[in-house]
Amino acid sequence: MKFFVVIVFCAIFLSVSGDSDNMQDTCPTAPGEQSIFFINGYPCKNPTKITAQDFKSTKLTEAGDTDNYLQSNVTLLTALEFPGLNTLGLSVSRTDLERDGSVPFHSHPRSSEMLFVVKGVVFAGFVDTNNKIFQTVLQKGDVFVFPKGLLHFCLSGGFEPATAFSFYNSQNPGVVNIGEVFGIDQEHIKIMTRCLATGSGCRVTDGDEL
């Protein structure tokens, strides 16, 4: 009897915790001005007004602006920017890295991430809950996975700019930037990321050892 109760409980838990299946074939996000209520997600566009353009985006065709201190840019498309993704549990991003570019430690609380390198060399890694770091060098055509919620980073690892695309199993993965949480400036964040990635002893400009 106890075993039966446990089985029933597990079945109920899995059915509640899993994502719901789509109730219709498509559900492009409705424009903001048409939203009159708030839900966990985005309301669907009027079915009579859905077109093929709702499922196409050209926002990742061009490189992002890397003229900044980190010399990098991440362009993320969620269901808000790409209506056709709504209810599909997917999102996508493009990462552009200059020769010394970096995307410092951050996490996605609602999604895992699969990174696919299409140009250059990328040094990427993540830290698990045992504080163990997993890192590797990625070249064109290589794929690397960042588990859900774990801190991760990527750096340009070659002598030329690098480009990678990421795919997420959530239409809104969310981003937690460690530097912004603790008010650490970008210079220190960039140095810390490279120190952890290379395993070398580093010192920041004020002489404090990292």
From Swiss-Prot:
Mn(2+) binds at residues 106, 108, 113, 152. Glycans are attached at residue 73. One of its GO terms (molecular function) is manganese ion binding. It comes from the Eukaryota. Keywords: Apoplast, Disulfide bond, Glycoprotein, Manganese, Metal-binding, Secreted, Signal. It holds the Pfam family Cupin_1. GO terms for cellular component: apoplast. Disulfide bonds join 27-44. It is found in: Secreted, Extracellular space, Apoplast. Residues 1-18 form the signal peptide. May play a role in plant defense. Probably has no oxalate oxidase activity even if the active site is conserved. This is Germin-like protein subfamily 3 member 4.
